[in-house]
Amino acid sequence: MHDKPVALVTGANQGIGLQIAKELAAKNFTVLVGSRDLARGEEAARMVDGGARALQLDVTDQASIAAAAERVRNEFGRLDVLVNNAAITHTRRLPDQTVEEYAKSTRPSVVSLDEIRAVFETNVFGVVAVTQAMLSLLREAPAARIVNVSSGVGSLTRNSDPTCKLAPASRCRLRP
């Protein structure tokens, strides 16, 4: 039996997810660094003190999610904390682009439907799929927790801002 609590952080190979992984490791968790790209996950795991482990996990791929859940079950038998952090945005503002130009380029009326689907697959449906796959493992833990990471762009108030479009619409679905 594994003595330390086990935490899985999706999208932990960079940014906020990586920092969350570091913080959990500092609190004596065994941290699983969830990443679509295993090599990037392994690189990130080396940056986390406390022996974090990379876990290949594409939140938009049911087979990847199932394989990750099976690995957690086989190696640890439970999951104490699930941090749903993985998220994407479809576009970035170019350095020479004005706010007005950027707002026009990100309107749902001009963004391709494939891009919109990709954002929602990761930011909304990926959270649901990973949570569903990990629920039985979370139920094995004495005091399991699920943390859904959102951001200011997920604010319903900000989501009504006409200059703020697609990613906020997907992230506000995670707000309590």
Give each language-model segment a name.
Residues 55-56, 121:
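Conserved residues in the N-terminal Rossmann fold of short-chain dehydrogenase/reductase
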Residues 1-32:
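Canonical Rossmann dinucleotide-binding motif of NAD(H)/NADP(H)-dependent dehydrogenases/reductases
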Residues 83, 130-134, 138:
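Hydrophobic positions on the long internal alpha-helix
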Residues 38, 56-70, 113, 127:
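The beta1-alpha1 cofactor-binding region of Rossmann-like NAD(H)/NADP(H)-dependent oxidoreductases
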Residues 8, 80-83, 147:
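N-terminal Rossmann-like NAD(P) cofactor-binding module of classical short-chain dehydrogenase/reductase
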Residues 27-43:
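Conserved glycine-rich Rossmann-like NAD(P)H-binding loop of the short-chain dehydrogenase/reductase
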Residues 87-120, 139-176:
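Catalytic loop of short-chain dehydrogenase/reductase
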